[in-house]
């Protein structure tokens, strides 16, 4: 297993880092925690067709600000996104005009799942 910190900053990007995004590369999966602006580096680390799972911890801006970059990615596999209740609605607002193209136009297919407490 390899852990890569793509972003570790708090509220905003700086010369030395981006907002939160962590990649865990395991034998069977890629697991991504949060979608801060560090997410734009993700495709540099995805070099196989292992499933990709993205977990959104919460909807503060610095944890989802990188979602607009999904239009850059050309992953062959589905990108599975997990988040709390309301994730679909948030994604439909953030992954849309005027920020980026709508979800339906993304080159990578998304599968969105909402998790409940408990």
Segments predicted by a language model, with ranges:
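Binuclear metal-dependent hydrolase catalytic cores
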Residues: 1-118
């Amino acid at each position: 297993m390899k852990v890569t910190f793509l972003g570790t900053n708090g509220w905003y990007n700086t010369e030395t880092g981006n907002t939160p995004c962590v990649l865990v590369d395991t034998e069977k999966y890629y697991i991504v925690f949060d979608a801060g602006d560090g997410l734009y580096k993700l495709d540099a680390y995805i070099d196989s067709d292992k499933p990709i799972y993205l977990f959104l911890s919460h909807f503060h801006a610095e944890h989802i600000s990188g979602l607009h970059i999904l239009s850059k990615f050309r992953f062959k596999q589905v990108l599975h996104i997990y988040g709390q209740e309301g994730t679909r609605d948030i994604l439909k607002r953030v992954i849309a005009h005027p920020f980026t193209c709508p979800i339906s136009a993304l080159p990578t297919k998304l599968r969105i799942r909402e998790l409940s407490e408990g």
